[in-house]
């Protein structure tokens, strides 16, 4: 079972130590989609998974740019840097946009 943290308006998983691996879930996903990945990689990586506010953001803000902005705010709030970012489905698209707009924050 994943330990979900709540801090400064964000819900997220933050487990393990080592280089940071940030995972973004898809449109119909949630934090639990990544549980097996957390179990496998948290011994080697700091695995961070924010809960994307797909259904709680105002509809006009819930597009790709709004979600990218949310991820930027999340990264700044918890102080992430030099991370590997990846996602599945919609989360993969948001991860790509984040990396393109913030190349100094990602290692791959």
How should each PLM-predicted stretch be described?
Residues 36, 70, 94:
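Short Gly/charged-rich anion-binding patches and loops
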Residues 81-108:
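Conserved hydrolase catalytic core segment
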Residues 39, 48-86:
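Active-site loop/oxyanion-hole signature of alpha/beta-hydrolase fold enzymes
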Residues 1-9:
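N-terminal cap/lid segment of alpha/beta-hydrolase-fold proteins
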């Amino acid at each position: 079972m994943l330990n979900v943290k709540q801090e400064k308006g964000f819900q997220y998983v933050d487990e393990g130590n080592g280089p940071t691996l940030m995972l973004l879930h898809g449109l119909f996903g949630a934090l639990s989609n990544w549980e097996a990945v957390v179990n496998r990689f948290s011994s080697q990586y700091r695995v961070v998974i924010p809960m994307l506010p797909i259904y709680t953001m105002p509809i006009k803000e819930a597009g790709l740019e709004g979600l990218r902005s949310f991820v930027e705010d999340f990264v700044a709030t918890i102080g992430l840097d030099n991370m590997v970012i990846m996602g599945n489905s919609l989360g993969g698209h948001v991860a790509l946009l984040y990396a393109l707009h913030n190349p100094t924050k990602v290692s791959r």
